[in-house]
Amino acid sequence: MRAASRHVDYGKNRLLAALPPDEIERLLPTFQQISFSLGDVVYESSGHLDYVYFPTTAIISLLYTMENGSTAEMGLTGNDGVVGIALFMGGGTMPNRAVVQSAGDAIRMKAKVLQAEFATGGEFQRLLLRYTQALITQISQTAVCNRLHSVEQQLCRWLLLSHDRVATDELIMTQELIADMLGVRREGVTVAAGHLQDIGAISYVRGRIQILDRQKLEDTACECYRVVKDEFDRLLK
C-alpha cells in the first residue's frame, strides 16, 4: 500500500459519488488516495482499525481463515462500497481479514473522522447503513451458494461480482487465488474455468482472465448472483 497522487477521484466510488455537494465539500480534505498491490493486507482478524477504505479501482476480499489455515471468502468490496464497517457499527474490530484481490486505488479516511461524520446522521450515515444491509445480503448469499451450488456456478457468480466492480474486462488473478476465495480445491477451479473457456465465456492465460461473453457467464451462474446484484442496485441506486 502506498500513497497515490494528491488528486482524489472520489467519484469512482458509488457511495462517495452519491453524497450531496455540501457533505463532499466538508469531507474532501479528509480523503487520502492510496494504491494497493495484489495481496496487500488491509486489516487482520481482530486487528485495530485506524481507517476505512472506499475502493475506486481496487477490489478487496473479506476472508475468514480457519485454525488449520484454510480460507474462504465471505464477501468482496469494490467501487460499490467501503471496507471497515465495524468502525461505524460500533465494533471497532472484525473477525475476518481484508486482502486485496485486484490491485488498484482506494480512498481512505481516518476512523475518528468517519465516526464523527456518521454521528451527524446525514446522507453519509444513510448510505453507509444501506451499504451494510447490501453487504449482509452478499455474505448470506455466498454461504448459500457455497453450500448448494456447483464450483462452476460459484465461479461464475464470483467472476460476475468482480467484473461489476472494475472498469475493465480483464481480471488478474491465479486459479490458486480463486480456489482460496471460494474455499474449494484448485482442481475444481481448473475444470470449471476450462469449461467456461470451451463455451467462449472467458479466456484464461497466465493469471489473466478475460471476460469474453458476460451473458454466457450470467446464463451459467446460479440465482445467487442476481439476488446480490438486485439488492445492491435497489439499496444503492
What do the predicted segments below correspond to?
Residues 1-37, 82, 87-88:
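Cyclic nucleotide-binding regulatory module and flanking cytosolic helices
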Residues 40-102:
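Cyclic nucleotide-binding regulatory domains
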Residues 18, 76, 108, 172, ...:
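Short aromatic/basic micro-patch
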Residues 59, 104-106, 208:
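Structural motif
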Residues 102-103, 117-185:
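Polybasic "coupling" helices that flank or enter modular domains
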Residues 75-130, 137, 141:
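Cyclic-nucleotide recognition modules
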Residues 22, 57, 112-113, 134, ...:
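Alpha-helix/helix-capping structural signal
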Residues 160-237:
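Phosphate-/nucleic-acid-contacting segments
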